[in-house]
Amino acid sequence: MLALAIVAALFAAQAAVPPAPTRWVEDGVGLLSPATRSALDARLEGYQHATGHQVVVWIGDTLDGAPLDEWAVRTFAAWKVGRQGLDDGVAMFILVGDRAIDLEVGYGLEGQVTDAAAAQIIALMAPRLRAGDRDGAVTTGVEAVLATIEGRPWTGGSTPTDAPAGGPTTLQWILGILAALGFLVLAITHPRFAMMLLWTVATAGRGRGGFAGGGGRSGGGGARGRW
């Protein structure tokens, strides 16, 4: 009976994993202004399309005393953050009621976003949160994560001057034009095959939110802290 009671207590202490997000920035408590939330969401969506790396931000209230690190690992795995086989994802969890931040890093990015680097990013965010600069804190954290992944110098500002815009590069434009021309030739020479290809591409992502990943292995890499 004692063993059953201990097991029951352990399960009761576990905070539930939230539903997988459908966007790159989920703010369930209104920490961010709508403009900042939209801007960061677009920034991270563009970054994923440009690099393949998946960085997400989830903002909630409290875990009611449950261990943050254990919950973050379970949530990261359940959401499958990052690409399958690469696990190149980072999740920033912010618990406003607990005044806590967790940066969970997938195995594929642990070489770039080390535990020490993750701790430094949280240290950049904490004083801004204490001062009430919520938008600036999260924007700073996001830009610091991206700069760290790319190995760019980081001075701690909220908008690095050398940060990429996240939109298509010249090479991507050229490849897109070549792909369009190739499809046009295929449509003329083999119209049925072209239509099948178009249908396959159009339906490949149905049933998934824009966020959907395939990774999720982290092993607890990253850091956590409070403000």
Language-model features: locations:
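Detector for methionine-enriched segments
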Residues: 1, 92, 125, 195-196
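Low-complexity, glycine/proline/serine-enriched intrinsically disordered segments
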Residues: 11-14, 144-227
